[in-house]
Amino acid sequence: MSQPITRENFDEWMIPVYAPAPFIPVRGEGSRLWDQQGKEYIDFAGGIAVNALGHAHPELREALNEQASKFWHTGNGYTNEPVLRLAKKLIDATFADRVFFCNSGAEANEAALKLARKFAHDRYGSHKSGIVAFKNAFHGRTLFTVSAGGQPAYSQDFAPLPPDIHHAAYNDINSASALIDDATCAVIVEPIQGEGGVVPASNAFLQGLRELCDRHNALLIFDEVQTGVGRTGELYAYMHYGVTPDLLTTAKALGGGFPVGALLATEECASVMTVGTHGTTYGGNPLASAVAGKVLDLINTPEMLNGVKQRHDWFVERLNSINHHYGLFSEVRGLGLLIGCVLNADYAGQAKQISQEAAKAGVMVLIAGGNVVRFAPALNVSEEEVTTGLDRFAAACEHFVSRGSS
């Protein structure tokens, strides 16, 4: 008989780069999870915007099981039918002409930044290497992507960092304009800063970046790892803004819980990449591709995308009502089902404590820094699940406020 697994085993066996919750989920269905003790949770965290169709979706299970019964992996010396079907679906649904598949958002962003450097080197010369990114951004945990993310807390322990990366203020086109010039090879930006506090870009800001990139022959990269695959009520957030990038990165919800990432590119951009310039062993494997193909089939429909916008209204209306009663938040912001509740000055820095109270009440939420409680639920979360989950969140807020005043 195997040894029982407990939360304490994490602290004993794992490299301590995470501080997970005190409970261990063991089973999920839809937007509900159950832990080892059988306690039920409504999941508004969605695996950090990953579980776009909830837990154990029957059609995703079927797609995975069907491919698992055939073959799992061959490596990049061979292609496979599921990955080619997935590539065609992404190309047909977006601006892209070409796709590179990998395993995560960080890998997709790494590929985008490498492509941008190579594009500039081949077309204009090695002097054109500057990358402009934004303060409080998050693009992944590789050395290149953590350097592009404008959060020193994630990068300062790993110096020396890759050079020629510059950070402007987000949503400030004048700040960006001061850094973008003819030596800039690329600008990388999140249409909504997720980890940075659920901060949507303005239309004018993204349009201004597009114009600056065109003027200086720089590539515009949209990091849609968190905003992509229906999260904002459009398949990709660039469609909401009406600003088309040269490169787009996607992951998280693309696999619905199965690890997969992709870089989408125009033909012109992709043309500089040749055999051997980049690669990955697992990227585009048939298991991930089969699941992701089914995810796109289910999400890229008018009914699903319009439903995201409807669910946004359910959340925002109720969160504003909760705030009316307890006075925790200065703002409820976001697009679609990426929503942030910004704590007011009286409760600054206490988002983690609120998320912990929420878990005790039976609802899972995220944070985005110390001042923002973040919601990234399944796109198909039911009205009953929204009501029940927000009832529990309201109870958590009541307990948090009463505890603080006692």
UniProtKB/Swiss-Prot annotation:
Keyword Transferase: yes
Keyword Transferase: yes
Coiled coil: none
GO molecular function, one term: pyridoxal phosphate binding
Pfam families: Aminotran_3
Disulfide bonds: none
HAMAP family: ArgD_aminotrans_3, AstC_aminotrans_3
PANTHER family: AMINOTRANSFERASE CLASS III, SUCCINYLORNITHINE TRANSAMINASE
Name listed for the protein in its UniProt record: Succinylornithine transaminase
Organism: Escherichia coli (strain SMS-3-5 / SECEC)
Lineage: Bacteria, Pseudomonadati, Pseudomonadota, Gammaproteobacteria, Enterobacterales
